[in-house]
Curated annotation (Swiss-Prot):
PANTHER family: SERINE HYDROXYMETHYLTRANSFERASE, SERINE HYDROXYMETHYLTRANSFERASE 1. The record marks 224 as: Plays an important role in substrate specificity. Keywords: Amino-acid biosynthesis, Cytoplasm, One-carbon metabolism, Pyridoxal phosphate, Transferase. The modification N6-(pyridoxal phosphate)lysine is found at residue 225. Pathway: One-carbon metabolism; tetrahydrofolate interconversion; Amino-acid biosynthesis; glycine biosynthesis; glycine from L-serine: step 1/1. This is Serine hydroxymethyltransferase. GO terms for biological process: glycine biosynthetic process from serine; tetrahydrofolate interconversion. GO terms for molecular function: glycine hydroxymethyltransferase activity; pyridoxal phosphate binding. Its cofactor is pyridoxal 5'-phosphate.
Length: 410
């Protein structure tokens, strides 16, 4: 019996999702498109195999082939970032972060990470997250004038808080992060330094953003986003921390690893080691900067921090007629996918927000160049300025879908 016949409901939903992905313009900064090889690995027979433990040190038999796959993933990841140690088993970035905390901290220890409205992630100390419940969390923000990291202010706060760990990295910050300055702050107050490079990992791998490996005590990341791999997480560190980090993943926070996902990671890391991956990463940044220019040239839409050095940026919509939620929903109707985003010192609910986040990793994978990116930004501006004009919005949707369909993904 075919897949379609066996479960027509699920089959139909997947087909519709495939069509949606092809006809829409994906601008959510945390999303990307994997290669067919990565997708094939995730659907392979490796999903049938349980393999608690680590390569060549398993608790189950029959692991000789998954050992090969996982070791390849480890070796490629270490080569990609110049790391002494790598763990490819975390199921997600959040679980990688949880394990990193567990390896270095005790419950109740203090952590200092970026606040949500400044661009940080839930797992960097937000009170609704385990990171803000298990640990005493404190957060730093941005300079109110430049909307960028103020390292002197962070250092002052670190001296006052005296955290056991400082967390650098963000999910919505468009400028270069100077990890060496965070290292100096951590050293001054006797703290561990953890870097979450989930969003910028692909840019780091391509040499287009400073590499935190070798600077931070521990580095975590997702494997999707700018790395274009399957959804999952990784941990990088020094060999001296290998035992405690391995134990924090298994048996500390996970059981059997997802070897079919690890196979996808191995393939994605191999792809990122190829010279053409740097070309891709360079185009990601060029596209983001081209889009940011369009918005900055308007009178009522502003790019937070003035621009971008990476794959994303946030738009301040406070001078328009729409909030973040309304803009996200509006753009959904014209086949452009974004997400609402809190701005520095946000006054609205996180379910509403005053801005949206834009990312170019996914459209660049589909072959969009600066001209295409500029076109997309202009369509967004038109939609926002004519949010109540059905005729204009229908035309924007036609143009967006036509552009998307000229760049089909694999």
């Amino acid at each position: 019996m075919s897949y379609q016949e066996l479960d027509p409901i699920v089959w139909s939903a997947i087909q519709q999702e495939s069509a949606r992905q092809n006809r829409t313009i994906e601008l959510i900064a945390s999303e990307n498109f994997t290669s067919q090889a990565v997708r094939a690995a995730q659907g392979s027979v490796l999903t049938n195999k349980y393999a608690e433990g680590y390569p060549y040190k398993r608790y189950y038999g029959g692991t000789e082939y998954v050992d090969v796959v996982e070791q390849v993933a480890i070796d490629r990841l270490k080569e990609l970032f110049g790391a002494e140690y790598a763990n490819v088993q975390p199921h997600s970035g959040s679980q990688a972060n949880a394990a990193a905390y567990m390896a270095f901290l005790k419950p109740g220890d203090k952590i200092l990470g970026m606040s949500l409205d400044a661009g940080g992630h839930l797992t960097h100390g937000a009170k609704v997250s385990f990171s803000g419940k298990v640990y005493e969390s404190h957060t730093y923000g941005l300079n109110s004038e430049t909307e960028t990291l103020d390292y002197e202010a962070i250092a002052k706060q670190a001296r006052e808080v005296k955290p056991q760990m400082i967390v650098a990295g963000a999910s919505a910050y468009s400028r270069i992060i100077e990890f060496d300055k965070f290292r100096a702050i951590a050293d001054e107050v006797g703290a561990y330094l953890m870097v979450d490079m989930a969003h910028i990992a692909g840019l780091v791998a391509a040499g287009l953003h400073p590499n935190p490996v070798g600077i931070a005590d521990v580095v975590t990341s997702t494997t999707h986003k700018t790395l274009r791999g399957p959804r999952g997480g990784v941990i990088l560190s020094q060999e001296k921390y290998a035992k405690q980090l391995n134990s924090a993943i298994f048996p500390g926070s996970q059981g059997g690893p997802l070897e079919h996902i690890i196979a996808g990671k191995a393939i994605a890391f191999g792809e990122a080691l190829q010279p053409k991956f740097k070309d891709y990463a360079q185009q990601v940044i060029k596209n983001a900067q081209a889009m940011a220019k369009v918005f900055n040239d308007t009178e009522d839409i502003r790019v937070v921090a003035g621009g971008t050095d990476n794959h994303l940026f946030n738009l301040d919509l406070t001078k328009t007629a729409l909030n973040g939620k309304q803009t996200q929903e509006l753009l959904d109707t014209v086949s452009i996918t974004t997400n609402k985003e809190a701005l520095p010192n946000e006054q609205l609910s996180p379910f509403v927000t005053s801005g949206i986040r834009i990312g170019t990793a996914a459209i660049t994978t589909r072959g969009f160049d600066e001209d295409d990116a500029t076109n997309v930004a202009e369509l967004i501006v038109t939609a926002i300025h004519h949010y109540d004009d059905e005729k204009v919005l229908k035309q924007v949707k036609r143009e967006a879908e036509a552009l998307a369909m000229t760049h089909l993904f694999e």
